[in-house]
Design a protein with these regions (language model features):
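PRPP-associated nucleotide enzymes
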Residues: 1-165
């Protein structure tokens, strides 16, 4: 895409992170009545997952990539039949979220939904079938490699947290 959204800078200010997460928590409470566990993908989801977990008084764990694949480490686990909410900082294609879904299914737990500070997905690019609760919805077009506009082709992809084309 022609735009990059970085939540790490916002989340580096504890009071701002707390304020954003309180507001998002209220939306989450309205949408999801029963949450047993919050799962956040590293790196971007760790701070928001922790803040939301603190506010909602829910256990929060994170998954991390090892050899390109999300796994649970550090003694984290997902209990069978638990109701799990996936929380990210930004959702674009939903690819990271769907990788988290695999961990939930493997544990025979139940995915209840997704939440993020920024939802910049579009129906065209989204791989998620469930509704996303977000603080902000931003419409930013994304492109497949073979459909990339000429003005973007010359710009190297060097943004932290992004997946390379």
């Amino acid at each position: 895409s022609s735009k990059y959204i970085q939540c790490a800078k916002l989340l580096s200010f504890p009071k701002k992170a707390e304020k954003i997460c309180k507001s998002l928590s209220n939306k989450i409470k309205k949408k999801f009545k029963k949450i047993d566990l919050i799962l956040a993908p590293a790196m971007g989801g760790i701070i928001i997952g922790y803040e939301i977990g603190k506010i909602l008084k829910k256990e929060t764990i994170f998954c991390e990539r090892v050899n390109g694949k999300f796994i649970l480490r550090r003694g984290f686990s997902i209990k069978k039949n638990s109701r799990v909410l996936i929380i990210e900082d930004v959702i674009t294609t939903g690819k990271s979220s769907m990788e988290c879904v695999k961990l939930i299914k493997k544990a025979k737990a139940k995915l209840i939904g997704f939440a993020s500070i920024i939802d910049r997905s579009s129906k065209k690019s989204l791989k998620i079938n469930q509704k996303i609760v977000s603080q902000f919805k931003i419409n930013v077009p994304t492109y497949k490699k073979n459909k990339l506009p000429n003005y973007l082709k010359s710009i190297p992809i060097t943004i932290p947290g992004s997946r390379f084309i």
